[in-house]
């Protein structure tokens, strides 16, 4: 199907006259979320709300609360350790730093993964959540060859049913970290 904003697109005609009791009409799309197909509108204009109106989010109605704990490393830039909003907590990417020193626990991906997950646990606890309330994690690895090793450690903290997860190899991480994990949890 061809979609266009504010203009019609002519494509080969389709004969649906028997089924739709209409003449042969080209497939026409006008605007996002509405189309005319063989003379039949797929989006009915009415006095009701515009399409997708229920998906809008008003920033003024969302109450945000900053989560901060000294039991996890401080943010390395202008961001929060976590934010609570709408019964969810959003944790920023966490590194394998020792909170008291700001230094990596070691250069090994195993030790950094353990420390990342411990730091995440402290931030989750400060927000009123825990590992069992995590619904989504995103893991960023400096080397995807560490995937299996990270999975073995990760499974100790997130037994089945595990949260939804994405894992990516990235070009670089802050402070040349081996791993960074962010997550979303319910409250």
Curated annotation (Swiss-Prot):
Once renumbered to this chain, the transit peptide range reads 1-58
Give the enzyme's EC designation.
3.5.99.10
Supply the InterPro entries for this chain: RidA, RidA_CS, RutC-like_sf, YjgF/YER057c/UK114
Provide the protein's localization: Plastid, Chloroplast
Q: Pfam families, from UniProt?
A: Ribonuc_L-PSP
Which residues hold substrate? 165
Mind telling me which residues the site (Stabilizes the substrate) is annotated on?
79
The residue ranges crossing the membrane are: none
What GO molecular function annotations does the UniProt record carry, in alphabetical order?
2-iminobutanoate deaminase activity; 2-iminopropanoate deaminase activity; deaminase activity
The consequence of residue 165 to A is:
Loss of activity
Q: Which reaction does it catalyse?
A: 2-iminobutanoate + H2O = 2-oxobutanoate + NH4(+); 2-iminopropanoate + H2O = pyruvate + NH4(+)
Pathway involvement of the protein, from the record: Amino-acid biosynthesis; L-isoleucine biosynthesis; 2-oxobutanoate from L-threonine
Any one GO biological process:
branched-chain amino acid biosynthetic process
Q: What happens when the gene is disrupted?
A: Reduced root growth and increased sensitivity of the root to added Ser.
Keywords per UniProt = Amino-acid biosynthesis, Branched-chain amino acid biosynthesis, Chloroplast, Detoxification, Hydrolase, Isoleucine biosynthesis, Plastid, Transit peptide
Q: Where is this site: Important for catalytic activity at high pH?
A: 180
Tissue expression pattern:
Expressed in leaves, petiols, petals, carpels and shoot apex.
**GO CC annotation terms, alphabetical:** chloroplast; chloroplast envelope; chloroplast stroma; cytosol; plant-type vacuole; plastid; thylakoid
Q: What does the sequence similarity comment in the record state about its family?
A: Belongs to the RutC family.
What exactly does this protein do?
Hydrolyzes the Ser-derived enamine/imine product of Thr dehydratase, protecting the plastidial branched-chain aminotransferase BCAT3 (AC Q9M401) from inactivation. Involved in Ile biosynthesis.
Check the record and name the NCBIfam families matching this protein.
Rid family detoxifying hydrolase
Q: What is this protein's name?
A: Reactive Intermediate Deaminase A, chloroplastic
Originating organism: Arabidopsis thaliana (Mouse-ear cress)
High-level lineage: Eukaryota, Viridiplantae, Streptophyta, Embryophyta, Tracheophyta
Provide the gene name from the record: RIDA
